[in-house]
């Protein structure tokens, strides 16, 4: 897809996680999307491969690629096989923009052997109809789009953050913002 795309990172630093994934209702100055992923390859009902990693937007002048496109490029070039079923799970700091949502939906329509679940910390420009339509297009392709809850943040902390064995420390407002965002997502998907 795009030869300039970097390979995924293994993890991110704690400060990056707390800044980028905090589920604020209004998240000013968070201009990047971070995407943590797991990929399970399944053959004959057994998990045959397991990949994890982290992508972020590449905003240099050569690639200018959103995190979702970085993942798709890497996945298509290095992982995807027509003889394997895949369960892919994303944990994202922002929900996809309309262009990325459309590209992911088109990819899934062409690859029925790939199932995708997206857990997102925040909804990107959820008040605009085209962003809502992007999320609906993903849902129509069978993608489960969910808002990250405490357990999802904790999972990310334990699996995608250089945490030095420190426990996840939830921030004030996590549960309240989760409920507000979950309701807003439900409204957007109708």
From Swiss-Prot:
It comes from the Eukaryota. (Microbial infection) Antiviral activity is neutralized by the HIV-1 virion infectivity factor (Vif), that prevents its incorporation into progeny HIV-1 virions by both inhibiting its translation and/or by inducing its ubiquitination and subsequent degradation by the 26S proteasome. This is DNA dC->dU-editing enzyme APOBEC-3C. It comes from Homo sapiens. DNA deaminase (cytidine deaminase) which acts as an inhibitor of retrovirus replication and retrotransposon mobility via deaminase-dependent and -independent mechanisms. After the penetration of retroviral nucleocapsids into target cells of infection and the initiation of reverse transcription, it can induce the conversion of cytosine to uracil in the minus-sense single-strand viral DNA, leading to G-to-A hypermutations in the subsequent plus-strand viral DNA. Residues 40-86 are annotated as: (Microbial infection) Required for interaction with human foamy virus protein Bet. The gene is APOBEC3C. GO terms for biological process: clearance of foreign intracellular DNA; cytidine deamination; cytidine to uridine editing; defense response to virus; DNA cytosine deamination; innate immune response; negative regulation of single stranded viral RNA replication via double stranded DNA intermediate; negative regulation of viral genome replication. Keywords: Antiviral defense, Cytoplasm, Host-virus interaction, Hydrolase, Immunity, Innate immunity, Metal-binding, Nucleus, Zinc. Homodimer. Interacts with TRIB3. Interacts with AGO2. (Microbial infection) Interacts with human foamy virus protein Bet; this interaction does not induce APOBEC3C degradation but prevents its dimerization and incorporation into the virion by binding of Bet close to or within the APOBEC3C dimerization site.
């Amino acid at each position: 897809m795009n030869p300039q795309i970097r390979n995924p990172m293994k993890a991110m630093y704690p400060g990056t996680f707390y800044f980028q994934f905090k589920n604020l209702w209004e998240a000013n100055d968070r201009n990047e999307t971070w995407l943590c992923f797991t990929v399970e390859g399944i053959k004959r009902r057994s998990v045959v491969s397991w990949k994890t990693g982290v992508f972020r937007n590449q905003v240099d002048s050569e690639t200018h690629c959103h995190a979702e496109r970085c993942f798709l490029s890497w996945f298509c070039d290095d992982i995807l096989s027509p003889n394997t079923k895949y369960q892919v799970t994303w944990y994202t700091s922002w929900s996809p923009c309309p262009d990325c949502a459309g590209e992911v939906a088109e990819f899934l329509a062409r690859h029925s052997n790939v199932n995708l679940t997206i857990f997102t910390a925040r909804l990107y420009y959820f008040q605009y109809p085209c962003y809502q339509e992007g999320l609906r297009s993903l849902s129509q392709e069978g993608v489960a789009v969910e808002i990250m809850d405490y357990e999802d943040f904790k999972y990310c902390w334990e699996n995608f953050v250089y945490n030095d064995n420190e426990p996840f420390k939830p921030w004030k407002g996590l549960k309240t913002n989760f409920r507000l965002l979950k309701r807003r997502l439900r409204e957007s998907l109708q």
